[in-house]
Amino acid sequence: MSRPAHKRPEYHKINKDLFVLTYGALVAQLCKDYEKDEDVNKYLDKMGYNIGTRLVEDFLARSCVRRCHSYSEIINIIAQVAFKMYLGITPSVTCHNSSRNEFSLILHKNPLAEFVEELPAGRSALCYCNLLCGIIRGALEMVHLAANVTFLQDRLKGDSVTEIGITFLKKLDEKKYRRKK
């Protein structure tokens, strides 16, 4: 038997509420496992990074985006296409400097924190959605861009919005990542 030609792969989606509740349970378990918020934040970032390195392939296959020629194009693709595709939201984009390598994604609604009213007592340094920073950083690294991705504001910490800061550091050496023939 052979595979049918030109059949598009099926993409399975899970219920958003199930994903958000499962993520909440994961963060709660990490808070039990690690005493320091910094350790939980580091673990969430590492998990996100690993997800981002794999998610970028799915994103590029499904979105059919063309090659970007500037950091602002990349940020707009992340905000308008990637966030919409995977989280169902479109964050606002702002640029912070004249060299156009520092940007912010402003999330007026954060789906990962939908069922969270406040951070647990004694966990003021916890970045509940640090997974997102890791995902963005991992995906950017896979397209040869080093970036620093951090939370600048967080609704769960009393801010009016959730803001993710992205600073593009440099383009990575593509030769290092090419497959050897």
From Swiss-Prot:
List, alphabetically, the InterPro entries matched.
Bet3, NO_sig/Golgi_transp_ligand-bd, TRAPP_component
Q: What is its main location?
A: Golgi
Q: Where is the lipid attached (S-palmitoyl cysteine)?
A: 68
Give the highest taxon in the source lineage: Eukaryota
GO cellular component terms attached to this protein's record: endoplasmic reticulum; Golgi apparatus; TRAPP complex
Give compartment(s): Golgi apparatus, cis-Golgi network; Endoplasmic reticulum
Question: Which key words are in the record?
Answer: Endoplasmic reticulum, ER-Golgi transport, Golgi apparatus, Lipoprotein, Palmitate, Transport
Tell me which SUPFAM superfamilies the record gives. Answer: Ligand-binding domain in the NO signalling and Golgi transport (SSF111126)
Q: Which GO terms describe its biological process?
A: Golgi vesicle transport
Q: One Pfam family name from the record?
A: TRAPP
Family to which the UniProt record says this protein belongs: Belongs to the TRAPP small subunits family. BET3 subfamily.
Q: Subunit structure, briefly? A: Homodimer. Component of the multisubunit TRAPP (transport protein particle) complex, which includes at least TRAPPC2, TRAPPC2L, TRAPPC3, TRAPPC3L, TRAPPC4, TRAPPC5, TRAPPC8, TRAPPC9, TRAPPC10, TRAPPC11 and TRAPPC12.
Function description = May play a role in vesicular transport from endoplasmic reticulum to Golgi.
Give the protein name, as stated in the record: Trafficking protein particle complex subunit 3-like protein
